């Protein structure tokens, strides 16, 4: 999910099942609204959709959270997996990869920023940048961003 959404750690870990629009593969995180960083909408690819559905099928609880792990446990699991695999990949590295990959696929910076929750504050940018969820979905779908294929090649 990190690599295909551009979400921050706490945005991802705070997601609730109701934040996911499966029909559009869209996430509307509601947990972050700072002065410079705001959650807007995020999208996930078919790879993430398949993995997420597989994960949710194993859950037999009524917990509304999408991921049942605390930030502290998540960090521990992430460090363990990184150590065991020998790959020094962090959540921030995946977020940066997402930004770089979207740029490589031709997405203008203002939309990459929007995907990553960096919505412009200026009146000019707000007025002349179409940041509607429908427009962002259209742009995201055109990229056909693939994570596993890219990681296998590099």
Task: Describe the role of every protein-language-model region.
Residues 2, 13, 113:
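The alpha-helix within a helix-turn-helix
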Residues 45-88, 92, 98:
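Active-site/catalytic core of tyrosine-dependent DNA strand-transfer enzymes
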Residues 5, 10, 14-54:
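Conserved tyrosine-mediated DNA breakage-rejoining catalytic core shared by Y-recombinases
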Residues 20-22, 88, 107-127, 150-153:
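Short, polar N-cap/turn motifs at the start of nucleic acid-interacting alpha helices
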Residues 1-10, 100-104:
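Short pre-functional
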Residues 17, 83, 104, 117:
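Residue-level detection of the helix-turn-helix DNA-binding "recognition helix"
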Residues 135-154:
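C-terminal secondary-structure termini that scaffold catalytic or DNA-interacting sites
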Residues 19, 101, 119, 131-135:
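The DNA-recognition helices of helix-turn-helix-type DNA-binding domains
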